[in-house]
Amino acid sequence: MKTQQGLSRRDFLRTGSASMLGLALSRLVPFAARQARADAAEISGAPQYDDWADVYRERWTWDRIAKGTHHVNCWYQRGCNWNIFVKEGLVFREEQAADYPQTNPDVPDYNPRGCQKGACFSHRMYDAGRLQHPLKRVGKRGEGKWKRISWEQALEELADATIDTIREYGPGSIVWDIGTAGTNGCSGLGIVRTCNVLDTPFLNANADIGDHHPGAAVTLGKICFASSADDLFYSDLILIWGGNPVYTQIPNAHFINEARYKGAEVVTIAPDYNASSIHADIWAPVNVGSDAALGLSICQVMVEEGLHDQAFIREQTDLPLLVRRDTRLFLRQSDLEEGGSDDVFYFFDPVAREIREVSQATLALEGIEPALEGEFAVATRDGEIIVEPVFAGLKRQLADYTPERATKISGTPASLIRRLARKIGRAGAATILTQSNFSKFYHGNKMERVKILVLALAGQ
């Protein structure tokens, strides 16, 4: 009997038997091959592997997984979370933990954090060039002759020398140079604690290597002041000015791209078309070391075109404060009263037509709009003088930094300077992303102060 497809019962059984035999052979042949390999391995002593992947499985085994991080690699917001794979007491692999919780559902999370510098940190830890034992100089200074000594001898000699020096010359005669490696973690805390107990000074590692941001320090009182990196997601204009975060801020750089996907415009101001420039909407070239001229020109355009935020300037900056035209110093209470304070300053109230003390309790102006321009006569203890707001002097100084003049210094096209100024002045939430570049320049403090001025004029 044949089916509708023309296949008889005998044909069906013959075909089915052949298929089942093929399936059986397909399982028997690999088993036989594996058995042959096992027999050969037993004879030769070679390891047994079912396939190439077993080689890696055998290699990547570990006793435990510890937690760790790496200090100072990125300067800002470092300390990425890493899983440390330990075998026989040695670190042999590091992997990003990538377990940061999302703190705000409207903002991208921090994951994964970490970069190739952290992934190879253990290589540095076990590098052959790393000093692992105390060495004592046995030749003349600079001769390069050393001998290995025990930890006991090293600590004893250091302690004796410290005690003798303090007794003879005082604690101020001992200076600790802890270096960047000692700025964080247990080693750094131990050194600082020792210095405090002994009353001995230690050098600032940031100043040693030019990471101390002197412009920010003298203008704002500290060198680190910023929101977390994910706050970039709220920016509509990001200026990468003084850094290359795609290379040097790898764990946080993804927030720049995510903000850009959201609609933010990214501008990189740099001498070279670097990795961060590639991922920017605009690259603004600038000659090395001329950023102050570029920044002042941006400020000049903002003031000339009325893009500066006058309400912000009046309340949040010292630009309304009165300055003496004769000494270029702030007008102080001590100028007006016998025994007056040196830290009480004044602004001019154009409605009341008189000077007023700047409150030391609040920034709120309570409806008063201090004058930003003009000259005013003030009676002091030494006679009448002329004063003006800081902003008036600033505006006069900025007149020398038109884009046409600044381009000769900075190399940035005048049209691009105006374009940048208008973007910054009209931005709703502009951010300048900077790093530790300008601290290493002569007059780098001026470059940092100018960037702060740009943001202040823009009300940012």
What are these regions (language model features)?
Residues P389, G393-R419, K423:
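A charged, amphipathic alpha-helical module
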Residues G170, N274-A280, R396-T402, R426-T434:
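Short acidic (Asp/Glu) and glycine-rich catalytic loops that position anionic groups and cofactors
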Residues P134, A161, V301, Q397, ...:
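Residues that form generic nucleotide/phosphate-binding pockets
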Residues E404, S415, L420, I424-Q460:
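A glycine-rich, hydrophobic/aromatic-adjacent loop/helix-cap motif
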Residues K2-F376, G383-I386, R405, P413, ...:
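N-terminal export/assembly segments and adjacent metallocofactor-ligating motifs
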